[in-house]
Swiss-Prot record:
Organism of provenance: Lactobacillus acidophilus (strain ATCC 700396 / NCK56 / N2 / NCFM)
Keyword Hydrolase in annotation: yes
Family matches, as PANTHER family: AB HYDROLASE SUPERFAMILY PROTEIN YCLE, MONOACYLGLYCEROL LIPASE
Record gene name: pip
Record-level GO cellular component terms: cell envelope; membrane
Family: Belongs to the peptidase S33 family.
Alphabetical UniProt keywords: Aminopeptidase, Hydrolase, Protease
Residue ranges annotated for the AB hydrolase-1 domain, each copy included: 28-277
Annotated Pfam families: Abhydrolase_1
Protein name from the UniProt record: Proline iminopeptidase
Function comment: Releases the N-terminal proline from various substrates.
Amino acid sequence: MEIIEGKMPFMGYETHYRIVGRRSEKSPLVLLHGGPGSTHNYFEVLDKLAKIDDRRIIMYDQLGCGNSSIPDDHPELYTKETWVKELKTLREHLALRKIHLLGQSWGGMLAIIYMCDYHPEGIQSLILSSTLSSASLWSKELHRMIKYLPIEEQAAIHRAELTDTFTEPDYLKANEHFMNQHAIDMKKKWPECVMREKKGGTVAYETAWGPNEYTPEGNLHDYEYTDQLSKIKVPTLITSGTDDLCTPYVAKTMHDHIAGSQWKLFENCSHMSFVQKTDEYIAMLKKWLDAND
């Protein structure tokens, strides 16, 4: 299977991209990773979709992580405006006139911002994977789920938030337990691309989002797009897991506000259903993409 990797000049830095599959008449699928700062790595589990569907799959490391430039000495660059500009620049650089767009977690937020604020042309369809339209609802839902943790772990998280200290061992243990339950359990064995140590991303994450998933205090703290979702007019598929950080309430909120959207809930999956049920996810994507080319 053909894989091309390259670098794109961007704002005096470089953005690393990866293209899987050969050029065909079908519109390519562009993947937006989460974080901010999580890198494209885990998306490599979707590589075989390129062969199965004869379609190019394009992924990239957003500025601040992975094989792209990591200008951590300029954290003011880590904003939604920068990352939207990077996506627009990538489309121009690779001449991506018509695409399908999939955003996972923060990548879905980026896709929503792009669709609602910039009204791009050439988007054949949108896939919102385990993402959110409201930072406040997300935080509220995650704090609800924290109440299912053991009492001592709840207390450790509460103390950390109260004192704005997120380095104590008891907090770190509690947060790890929570993320293993609802993001992905890293104690299990996953494909190499999922287990691969990522480069950078911490400064981007803490600058834009915050110290953890449930304390959004970075520059995205006021991310509130639920009431703007009606601006999305392209075919939209929402995916999430039953044990996801993106709770069914979060997913249904997006589904209810995007006319004609579809929602697929993956049983016994958390924040990465495409990793936990890869074959089922790829089959779903193939059917969706072929129907909306």
